[in-house]
Amino acid sequence: MSQTEGARLFRETWIAGVREHFPGEPKPGYVTPWEDTPEWEREAASAVYEQVRQFLALSSGHASRLTREQKSRFVATCWTAQMFKHFENPKPGYVADWPDLPDWQKETDSDIFEAIEKSLS
């Protein structure tokens, strides 16, 4: 899978997770299709996809044994680093520590890890 395809997988899984886990109606930006996603966000999705892919590869696939919480924490931490890369002063919600994230976001981050994992097998 190419970096672009991986980034799209990240975004499409994010949108599916938001639709499944978000309570009520999500903000439009949460479900913006890939074609309309800002370039910085595409780059961030690509980077996090690649970090998860490499993490799985470097563990010889054994990172799949992580709990859903551990998978979610990994994705969230990678995403936070991208927010600091792309924004001088990111919004606090963009860089919140994992325990402070809403449950829907934690679940969606786990879904992202598992979608990348599945794409590699």
Q: Where are the model-predicted features located?
A:
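Alpha-helical propensity feature that highlights long, continuous alpha-helices across diverse contexts
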Residues: 1-121
